Design a protein with these regions (language model features):
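Short beta-strand/turn micro-motifs at beta-sheet edges
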Residues: 2-6, 66-67
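Residue-level detection of the helix-turn-helix DNA-binding "recognition helix"
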Residues: 35, 54, 58
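Beta-hairpin "wing" of winged helix-turn-helix
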Residues: 57-74, 79
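Accessory beta->alpha helical hairpin/"wing" motif in late/C-terminal subdomains of nucleic-acid enzymes
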Residues: 80-84
Length: 122
């Protein structure tokens, strides 16, 4: 299932911040993780992901650096900043409140809150 653009605008940034919480990742790795770990629901193409990454970096929620991979190829790695960690904590609380509210009015089943936790990265 594909998510509508407006929902993706809200969920995309928090999903990227969460994936970067354990450690840095490069763009293709992030795109791949978004697709596989969300069952394709939050899959993003590069034309969506990279502007999102640049926006998060402009807000100082993530930082990037170039690094050589084992293949001697240069890759841009993204990492969560302290400011990004704080924002992620705030957004987690907001998403929990939103899911709770939608559950209370019957939009989501009561079991929806159980699946909020993501499995550990990597």
């Amino acid at each position: 299932m594909r998510v509508e653009r407006e929902l993706m605008r809200g969920a995309g940034p928090v999903a990227v911040l969460r994936l970067l919480e354990p450690g840095e990742m490069y763009g293709y790795e992030l795109a791949s993780a978004l697709g596989t770990r969300t069952g394709g629901v939050l899959a993003m193409g590069h034309s969506t992901l990279y502007p999102l990454l640049y926006n998060l970096e402009a807000k100082k929620l993530i930082a990037s650096r170039w690094r050589r991979a084992e293949t001697n190829r240069r890759r841009r790695y993204y990492a969560l900043t302290d400011r990004g960690r704080k924002r992620l904590a705030i957004q987690r609380d907001q998403w929990k409140a939103l899911v709770g509210a939608l559950t209370r009015i019957g939009v989501l089943p009561d079991t929806a809150t159980v699946s909020l936790r993501m499995e550990p990265a990597r």
